[in-house]
């Protein structure tokens, strides 16, 4: 697709640093210490099987459907209870479940960052956070 058909905000986008790291993590002989790719041998296969079987036997009708965008009400209620146990007052409606760090950072950036704002990040930092904050047109200050 030619760049002039893209929105101005998309015309200068570059490949993500994470995408570049993932390419290297797949190379023979490379032991990845990043990229969010844990060793599958470390997964709790039996525990995952038990959990999967429980979901499929108890909630089959819902397991393969789209859910509420803010998350499953029972999970949000449980998180509210955990927060209250730690002295944090909130309602289940205050809790939003996301599909991982990228979505969480994107939601936060859209809600809290205006173009030109400065975001303080630690050094070293999570590369994907820089990508999200960059799309929000933020400046970075590392500490």
Can you say where each PLM-predicted feature lies in the sequence?
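N-terminal "arm"/small-domain region of PLP-dependent enzymes with the aminotransferase-like
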Residues: 1-69, 73
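Conserved core of the PLP fold type I
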Residues: 57-143
